[in-house]
Amino acid sequence: MGDVKYYIHTAGASPNQASAEKIIALDLIGSAYALDAFGKVIAKGGAGLLVSSQTGYMWPPLTPEEEMQVMTTPADKLAELPCLKKITNPGIAYIVSKKANYLQVQYAATHCWGQRGARINTISPGVIVTPLAFDEFNAAGEGYQKMIDATPARRVGTPDEIGAAGAFLLSDAASYITGTDLLVDGGTIAALKNGKFKLTGLDD
């Protein structure tokens, strides 16, 4: 394949598309394998972008010890971590997977990607008008509408807005940005942290 200049990772399944086990396998472990694989062929000066989600900022947080485990455990050993094996709720699996994406990118930025002179970041979209979002709306539309109404933007985002933010992170204008996340959510997480709305359906 040769050296790769740019890499964008978009694979993932939502809580209404897959079981907790499958979400962790695809969104968390699959992302780890991809970061490792492309970290071996990314060109010097290259850049990568992993599309995550605003849910990585939501409940439940991993403990500091669990965060370190997820960040540093090799991809082929992640499925054995107790903090992941115990998850049975697809919503929690999705939240933890998206938190893990950012942790794994932090590690990659300072190890294989950084050692090759390349950058890697995540972008965390809020509610964006995509087929995946429609699946979630159909399953829990009222809850999503309450969340949208509570945010400062009071609307959903568009693919073009995420594309523009992603293009910036991959561009030379972002050459000093690596190992971090760009939250593009219309203020959803700010509203959540300030008590404007509460998450539901994450009791187990």
Predicted features and spans:
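Conserved hydrophobic beta-strands of the Rossmann-like cofactor-binding core
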Residues: 7-8
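Catalytic loop of short-chain dehydrogenase/reductase
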Residues: 13-17, 40, 44-116, 125-129
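A hydrophobic alpha-helix adjacent to the NAD(P)-binding/active-site core of NAD(P)-dependent oxidoreductases
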Residues: 23-24
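C-terminal helical subdomain
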Residues: 33, 93-94, 99-102, 122, ...
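A short C-terminal helix-loop "cap" of Rossmann-like NAD(P)-dependent dehydrogenase/epimerase domains
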Residues: 72-84, 137-151, 201-203
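Short, small/polar-rich loop/turn modules that mediate ligand/substrate recognition or access, typified
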Residues: 114, 119, 177-179
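Short C-terminal tail/terminal secondary-structure segment
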Residues: 178-204
